[in-house]
Amino acid sequence: MTYTELVAAIKSYTENDYSTTDINTFIKNAEQRIHNTVQLPDLRKNVTGTMTSGNKYFSLPSDWLSTFSIAVINSDNEYTYLLNKDVNFVRESFPDTDSGFYGKPEYYGIFDDTTMILGPTPDANYSAELHYYYYPQTIVTAGNTWLGDNFD
């Protein structure tokens, strides 16, 4: 289903000629509700990055919706998956005041919508792989989307 077909279907169903702004708001809200409720396998991505020595924060991709998993990768290409914990647990368990408490991260917490906090704070640079659910581009700006093409 394309954007044009969706707008026509909304107008037909509601028997009303809403403005483009109102219809776009309706569509974006519906898309967001679906993406926040249902974890669709086709809406998963993975990225690699580096956990930086002495930095307890790890940046999330701009299209990040939620984390599926995050792992530290060692030089032998072995993965160690981090456990998700509350931010307060990470802060209290791994105080960032003494580098003697630094080590290979074992836990993460979602600090805000752009950052996760790691515990313990990395004592070296570590390769990491993040698997996550993402917000796809809205049909309002893309014209069509995975959700629109697979709505049946």
Task: Spell out what each predicted region is.
Residues 1-152:
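Glycine-enriched, solvent-exposed interface loops adjoining structured elements
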